Amino acid sequence: MGISRTLSKLIMRSPIDFHGAVCQLGNQNIRFNSKQLMQDAEEVYFSIKSKTNFKRGVVASELYFNALGFNQVESIDISSNDKPSFIEDLGEDISNTKLINNFDLVFDGGTLEHIFNPDKALNNIKKMLKLNGHIIHQVPCNNQLEHGFFQFSPSYLNKFYEENNFLVKEILLICVGPPKLDDFMRVNVYVYDKEEVFRMHSKGINLPSTFLLMHFVAQKIAEDKLVIPKVDIQAEFSKMENQSKNIGYEKTNFLKSFFKSTFPNIWRKMGILKAVISRYSSTLYDRVTGHNLKKLGKF
């Protein structure tokens, strides 16, 4: 659990209200100092709410969130190692009434993947938030084998929150570099586009990244009972995969077009090679040109 300079900049530019009470899922390790925070805030046009002076480390998390504008900073963890405000197992129903409907922001900086019952944890987050409160998840998407129990697809969080009366405000994909180096280097951040990600998957296209993180922001807009979404994700994938094969097929099938127009007589005699070129030229084009996700920038 930790907040790098990249992740901090994404927090500061998040579409949330920076006031009131925040609860961290695990006491966050702040991987920069207050001087660097001031520099990063200026870069993303964020107004620091209070002067602060802190060094790197877990002890800085309260001062960090104070500087963002929160006057009450709490944390919850399963053990006392990092001195959390509350000791609770988020994989079970939380029992402390001080946690219910008490927070304007719940921040998950890499805890959800370590909880064996993530659906239970998400329900606890829902209960902890005040009406109109926000959740921010910064969790692994890809290439973090054995970092925790899970890596999350955006569809998982998106589906849960949409069906439980939350407004999903932002989903970003963060191309994180090698461990420990991401504190010193800027990384590419992309806006999540479900249809484009399905197309990339069907074409074997990946984002160039050692690790892939997700930055997810949603707002609680109504109170309701827990809903566990039921969806045939495989059927949805197959449908979108077929759509991706048809979108711009003639445009991307450049080898076929080239041969037909340049060597029409040879093309008519090519037999089975015509089918091979028609089948794979579009895929080759996609592999060369890569993805079409919107790049938010380097952070």
Task: Locate each region found by the language model.
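Glycine-rich phosphate-binding loop and adjoining beta1-alpha1-beta2 segment
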Residues: 34-66
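Membrane-proximal basic amphipathic "stem/tether" segments
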Residues: 239-299
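Conserved SAM-binding loop
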Residues: 22-25, 56-146, 218
